[in-house]
Curated annotation (Swiss-Prot):
It catalyses: cytidine(1402) in 16S rRNA + S-adenosyl-L-methionine = N(4)-methylcytidine(1402) in 16S rRNA + S-adenosyl-L-homocysteine + H(+). It is found in: Cytoplasm. It holds the Pfam family Methyltransf_5. NCBIfam families: 16S rRNA (cytosine(1402)-N(4))-methyltransferase RsmH (TIGR00006). Its EC number is 2.1.1.199. Gene3D superfamilies: Putative methyltransferase TM0872, insert domain, Vaccinia Virus protein VP39. This is Ribosomal RNA small subunit methyltransferase H. Belongs to the methyltransferase superfamily. RsmH family. GO terms for cellular component: cytoplasm. Keywords: Cytoplasm, Methyltransferase, rRNA processing, S-adenosyl-L-methionine, Transferase. Specifically methylates the N4 position of cytidine in position 1402 (C1402) of 16S rRNA. The gene is rsmH. It comes from Cupriavidus taiwanensis (strain DSM 17343 / BCRC 17206 / CCUG 44338 / CIP 107171 / LMG 19424 / R1) (Ralstonia taiwanensis (strain LMG 19424)).
Length: 329
C-alpha cells in the first residue's frame, strides 16, 4: 500500500528514486502548498501528502495521460493534478500565491521505459513514438521522416553527446531516400539497428543506440527548454524559505540545474560589465537569493535495489529574503 492507502499497481513497478531524501528536503512546513512537477506514478506525491497537515496542499503536474489516470486513484482533498508540463506552473498556479516547495524529478519512469508502445527503449520493439504526452505533438518517427540531415545530426550531437552523430544522421537520411516512402525509421528496432551499423566503436556496458534514443526523446519532448522555463517558474513561485529540489539523471539536465542554482546563490557582479569593473564591496552587490543546501546521490543499497537510480543527482536550494527583508508566507 502507498503512504496514502492507495493499492500499488502490480505491473511495471516504478521505484521512486531518493524518495525519503527528496521529501525530507522539500517539506519544511506541514501547512504549506507544494508542487510535484513530475507526478509519474505518484511515489513522491504520496509521500509528500503523508507529511502534510490538514491545511497543507499539493499540486502535481505531468504530461503523460497514464500519469494523470494514476493520479485519479488518490482520493485526497489536499491533492490536485494538472495535465501539463511543469514549465506551465506559473500560469496554472496564478492566483494561488507563493508555494513552500517545488520538486522536479526529471527521470523517465520505469513503466514508460518498459511499455513497448511508447517507443522510449531500444530493448522493446514498438512504434518510434517517444512523446511524454501522447495526445499532442509529433512522434520521433514523424520528426525523423521530415527533418534535414543537419538538424538530425545537431540533435543527436547536442542532446545525446554522441560522437557519431553525423554518421547516424547520414544513415537515417539515406534510409529515408532509399525507401521512397519518406519514413523508413518507424520502429525502435529500425532505429537501433541503423545506429548499430553507423557507430563504429562501442562503449563498455552501453548499447550503441543509448545516446541517440536519449537525444530524440529530449528533442521530441522539449525537455531542456521545459527545464529552463520550469526552474525560473519555480524560483518565482517560491516563498522565502521555500525549497527547490531537483533530481536529474544525465549531465545535460544536471548542468542546467547546477548553473541555475549557482547563479542565484552568489552576488551577481558578473551580470553587469559595469559592476565587474567597479571596486564594490560585497555588501554593495546584488545579494544571493538562493542558499545551496546540498547535492545528493543514491546510496549503494538503493542502487543495488534499483540500478536505474545509479545516475541520479539531487540538488537542493532554499529561497532567501531579498535585501531589505521579505515575507515568508
Amino acid at each position: 500500500m502507498s503512504p496514502t492507502g492507495t493499492p500499488a499497481t502490480p505491473a511495471l513497478q516504478h521505484r521512486t528514486v531518493l524518495l525519503d531524501e527528496a521529501v525530507d528536503a522539500l517539506v519544511w512546513r506541514p501547512d504549506g502548498v507544494y508542487v510535484d512537477g513530475t507526478f509519474g506514478r505518484g511515489g513522491h506525491s504520496r509521500a509528500v501528502l503523508a507529511r502534510l497537515g490538514p491545511d497543507g496542499a499539493l499540486v502535481a503536474f505531468d504530461k503523460d495521460p497514464a500519469a494523470i489516470a494514476e493520479a485519479g486513484t488518490i482520493k485526497d482533498a489536499r491533492f490536485s493534478i494538472e495535465h501539463a508540463s511543469f514549465a506551465a506552473m506559473a500560469e496554472r498556479l496564478a492566483g494561488r500565491g507563493h508555494v513552500a516547495g517545488v520538486l522536479l524529478d526529471l527521470g523517465i519512469s520505469s513503466p514508460q521505459i518498459d511499455e513497448a508502445a511508447r517507443g522510449f527503449s531500444f530493448r522493446f520493439e514498438g512504434p518510434l513514438d517517444m512523446r511524454m504526452d501522447t495526445t499532442r505533438g509529433i512522434t520521433a518517427a514523424q520528426w525523423l521522416a521530415q527533418a534535414d540531415e543537419q538538424d538530425i545530426a545537431r540533435v543527436i550531437r547536442d542532446y545525446g553527446e554522441e560522437r557519431f552523430a553525423v554518421q547516424i544522421a547520414k544513415a537515417i537520411v539515406a534510409r529515408r531516400s532509399e525507401s521512397g516512402d519518406g519514413g523508413p525509421v518507424a520502429t525502435t528496432a529500425d532505429l537501433a539497428a541503423l545506429v548499430a551499423k553507423a557507430v563504429k566503436t562501442r562503449e563498455k556496458g552501453q548499447d550503441p543506440a543509448t545516446r541517440t534514443f536519449q537525444a530524440l526523446r529530449i528533442h521530441v519532448n522539449q525537455e531542456l527548454e521545459d527545464l529552463e522555463r520550469g526552474l525560473k517558474a519555480a524560483y518565482d513561485l517560491l516563498q522565502v524559505g521555500g525549497r527547490l529540489v531537483v533530481i536529474s539523471f544525465h549531465s545535460l539536465e544536471d548542468r542546467i540545474v547546477k548553473r541555475f542554482m549557482a547563479a542565484h546563490a552568489r552576488p551577481q557582479q558578473d551580470a553587469d560589465p559595469a559592476l565587474r569593473r567597479a571596486p564594490l564591496r560585497a555588501a554593495d552587490l546584488p545579494q544571493p537569493t538562493l542558499r545551496l543546501l546540498g547535492r545528493y546521490k543514491p546510496g549503494a543499497e538503493e542502487v543495488a535495489a534499483n540500478p536505474r537510480a545509479r545516475s541520479a543527482v539531487m540538488r537542493v536550494a532554499e529561497k532567501l529574503a531579498p535585501a531589505g527583508g521579505g515575507a515568508r508566507a
